[in-house]
Amino acid sequence: MARKKLMRFKWNDEVHNLFQPEKDNYKFYKGNWKEYFKNTNPIVLEVGCGRAEYTTGLAALNPDVNYIGLDIKGARLWKGSSLSIETGLSNTAFIRTKLQNLEEFFLPGEVNGIWITFPDPKPRESEAKLRLSGLRFMNIYRRLMPQGGKVFFKTDNKVLFDHTLEVLTNPDLKITNLVYTHDLYQSELLSEHYGIQTTYEKTYLKQGVLINYLKFEFLPL
């Protein structure tokens, strides 16, 4: 294994802001994230966060909101974890987990918002249940935010985006204020992103690929 990767794994094992299965406190804060953050500020998740550009970028802009990035790859989470510590961000945390296990880390009502940024489109029908913007995951997000909450979704994949719009027509999800664009960089919605771009996004933009974006709110149950 490359020396750099070993150093990153060692970092992940030792830092306080990254939770992974090998640590005793892996699921300790479920229902009690206010103890970790030392406040009762709103919690926003970035699911499939990769290098956590949105987790760290938004946390720097909004110190009164707590941001948690989740991903299955520890090597990706290292980036957000290390940047947070280097820049003094105390309102971030990172969790290494399969995203279908979200409810093992948060109680209903503990989450206020969710960002889904450039997820794997999982194009095969056999993988449909793994799409982070599919109905299975939307129902998970719904359960985490029974009091209502906002969801934000960005992707370069128009097929996935259109599929997501179809998913959101399901009346059981009880959503409102859906707004979307097939070309974010020609939309007034761009200002909501504060110049934050993921690594994938930068690559797609150089290739001339359009970026799709939507946001909506869950109605309180």
Give the residues covered by each predicted segment.
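S-adenosyl-L-methionine
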Residues: M1-I43, E53-A60, S81-P108
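Short beta-strand element of Class I
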Residues: V65-I68
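A short glycine-rich, Lys/Arg-flanked "PGG" loop and its adjoining helix->strand segment in the class I
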Residues: S133-Q147
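Conserved beta-strand signature within the Rossmann-like core of class I S-adenosyl-L-methionine
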Residues: G148-T155
